[in-house]
Amino acid sequence: MKKITLLLVFFMFVTSTYSQLFVKDGSYLYNNDNVVFVKQDVNLETNSNIYLRNQAQLVQGKSGVSENKGEGKVSVYQEGTSNAFVYNYWCSPVGIASGTAGNTNFGILLMNRPTSVTASDVITTTYSNGTTSSSSLVVAQHWIWKYLTANGSGLGGPNGWIHVQDAQTLEPGQGFTMKGVSGTDITTVGEATSNNPGNNQRYDFRGRPNDGDIYVPVDVDDYTLTGNPYPSALNVNAFLLDAANTACNGIAYYWEQDKTDSSHYYVDYHGGYGTFSPISLGSNGVYMPATFNTYNWDGSLNTTGSSSGLAIERKYAPIGQGFMVFGDALGTITLKNSHRAYVKEGSGLSQFERNISSQSTVVSSLQVPQIRFDISLNNQYTRQLGLVLIPDATDGVDRGIDAKSPAEDSLPNDVYFFLDNDNSDGSSWEDDE
């Protein structure tokens, strides 16, 4: 068995494949714009590092639970798309670098501010408003929450949300919410843009790379916040349609929020959940943008919305992307190395999220045949529905195709497809009917 030991500085500019990867104390591996594929485990000794830069990714191929070990760290960047008042949903690609083998917990203090191609400063925290500058990055810990199905009564209300703050209690595969920061950081670290040209803060995730089987609990008629837990892209279709993951309904729900929001009060929030239907393993899937609802002081849904979200490619979740899943049964679903892929963000199939000013989208040549309906309701907001035309659609709810609406309570003036006594944002129809 081939085992690669790195004793000195090693720069990588081409795709490389290893059986095992060992980086010695004081050494590092630098990967620029390519993929490192390791068939089995990664062992990073103390003070060793793997730097993934310019969309470089680490993919591992071992089945079963992780055997990664060591106190060295992987460093990988991801950019948020929100200001100090707007949420992004995240899922960390790394955990605490400890001596015990396997995946470990995460907390936001494992996120850094890049200062050069390889160096970074540890972030600090405050209570409510995050800030950034060319000398510091301050994250507001008050807005760090996770949503666990066993603790809640449904999406959209305060029940089930657990306040994490800066504690290292986010288990592998648990997603979390985090608001962005105000200010700009013009520091350049070898990437295409500066650290934060405005509402696009770059974060440096540093820790042990997550790997292998990661278990996510689900329950009947409830949601769980999870996401992509790996330092590589995640094939969301493969995850949702895995034959072992039938405890969820096969749909991913993505939070979108109006980027112009400038208040921390629930009543001033404008946001909602878009739905992604994978359709099939080979399909690019169908994403129905969120309808932006407003919320009451307790976090429950108000009676009107404001506008709609953006068309975003969702087949491959980029590093750090969080999303909700919905349970059809009590049990667990599993994220696996077999669901991972090397797909660069912005390739036409993978986007973290887009600011409304970023309108360019690569149109795929493999679109699912569909009809979209943009329905304006009282000139207040638009509900988009999708009708997918596929040969194997049934009259019932088709798993991974028909998307249950994420709104627990329908608005008084709204429109849906009605399937099996439930509201759906997307439906399917046999193309010969």
Model-derived segments and spans:
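Compositionally biased Ser/Thr/Gly- and acidic/asparagine-rich
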Residues: V164-D166, L170-E171, M178, S182-E433
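Extracellular, surface-exposed repeat architectures
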Residues: A56-I108, R208-P231
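A conserved hydrophobic secondary-structure block that centers on an alpha-helix together
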Residues: V139, W143-G173, S182-I186
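Bacterial Sec-dependent N-terminal signal peptides
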Residues: M1-D25
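Conserved "landmark" site that anchors the functional core of diverse proteins
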Residues: F85, V94-Q141
